[in-house]
Amino acid sequence: MKKILAEIAYDGSIYHGFQIQPTKPTVQGEIEKALMKINKKKVKIHSSGRTDKGVHAKKQIITFDIKINIQLNNLKKALNAILLKNSIKILKLRYVKNSFHPRFSAQKRKYSYCILNSDNYYPWEGYQAHYVNKKLSISNLNQMAKTLIGKHDFTTFSCIKDKSKSKFRHIYFAKFKKRGKYIIFEIIGSSFLWKMVRSIIGTMLDIEIKNESISTFETILKSKNRNLARTTAPANALFLERVYYE
């Protein structure tokens, strides 16, 4: 039995996160149900990470094993015939070594956050974006983002329920970019704590909106005090962009 890697994309709006939950709709639950229809037996999938409720993915990585003999192209078509109506799409399928694990083999992960920073927009343009009516300074936001680069203790931006033994994470890239009426924040790190990216975004935006000193963000980061973090930014504007492997 060969291990199959799948690149998948999904709209997380209707799901209670990626990880399976017995009584709530999840991305993992829908994919495993689709695989069971095709395989006729239960199939367990493994992912590169668990996105929270409402968070989207442009290229999430999962792996699974199935016993039936089917060409990958036909398997992709069969899965998409079931999953597309549920806002999940299989982008690619390929075989990988049995030693490969989508989470533990990953080197880096990239997320993006979409901020709608204009009054000139259609109602549906805010569907997967966080609307901020005050004009934001890209320069100020990027000065705060620079302090994230390197290895830091991110206790301040962790969730109380996060069970990670270490709160240290390595951030390789963090930058805001203007794209028309949107401001896009991109961040690449070794991995991320539960709700860490949204907590970082929410804090930076709050400091900028209130015209506080840029140095406030670094002070909050170094404090290792969860109570100093500001409002967590909404989930609907966060995207898992890609996962990096060797």
UniProtKB/Swiss-Prot annotation:
EC numbers, comma separated: 5.4.99.12
User: Which residues does the annotation say bind substrate?
Assistant: 111
Q: Which SUPFAM superfamilies match?
A: Pseudouridine synthase
| Superkingdom of origin organism | Bacteria
Which keywords accompany this UniProt record? Isomerase, tRNA processing
Pfam families linked = PseudoU_synth_1
Q: What is this protein called?
A: tRNA pseudouridine synthase A
Organism, scientific name: Borreliella burgdorferi (strain ATCC 35210 / DSM 4680 / CIP 102532 / B31) (Borrelia burgdorferi)
What gene does this protein come from?
Answer: truA
